[in-house]
Amino acid sequence: MKKKFILSACVIFIIAIIVIFYRMRYDISNTYVVYEKEDYYYEVIIKQYDGKVIISEEYHCLEPIVQEIDKDMLTVTVGRGDYWVTRFINVRDGVVSEGFGNMVAYSHDKVVYPAYKDGDMKIIVQDIFDENKYYYEIIRDYAPVAVGKYMIIDAKFLDDTTLYLKYYRGEEWEEVEEIIDL
């Protein structure tokens, strides 16, 4: 009886150690670090769970903001004033997105941001890592602004295929709300 108890305790202890090690190994907070150096220099290092470096970058006078947004996903945002650029990093797969200027919303696979393209102000909805998978332009009579983020009041995904968008329209800056099927 005593042997069975000791054996059971050992098995439980080993399982607990394995679970703790597994959780630590796959804990996203162990995949990144931001160092503050001298003279307003900052260094960001982001690694995959296996330790392989995905990003190692320095910034001067811009403190990068690293956020854990999902089990395997981080964002790195850098900017000041009216313009901020956000990149998404999948630490499991080692994939890094392009930089999105003044991002206003995101889901698990899409991002929403304003952009001035082809002579028009647009709101772009696209796949985070590959615009060839999904890309959608929302073109309206937006309020005239120099910086696109000021025309957007609110944006959020209601589900995988529906976007709520509130923005300013026209010279009078009329508030408009839309539900957009993507």
Which residues make up each language-model segment?
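Generic structural microfeature
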Residues: 5-9, 84, 158
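Surface-exposed loop/turn elements that mediate protein-protein interactions on large endomembrane-trafficking
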Residues: 41-57, 80-99, 122-145, 171-182
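Generic beta-strand structural signal
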Residues: 36-37, 68-69, 91, 105-106, ...
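N-terminal Sec-pathway targeting helices
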Residues: 1-14, 18-20
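Short beta-strand elements that form the blades of beta-propeller/WD-repeat-like
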Residues: 29-36, 70-81, 108-117, 161-168
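Terminal domain-start segments
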Residues: 19-79
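Repeated scaffold domains used in trafficking and secretory/extracellular systems
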Residues: 60-67, 98-110, 144-155
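Long, ordered, amphipathic alpha-helical scaffolds
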Residues: 150-156, 160-182
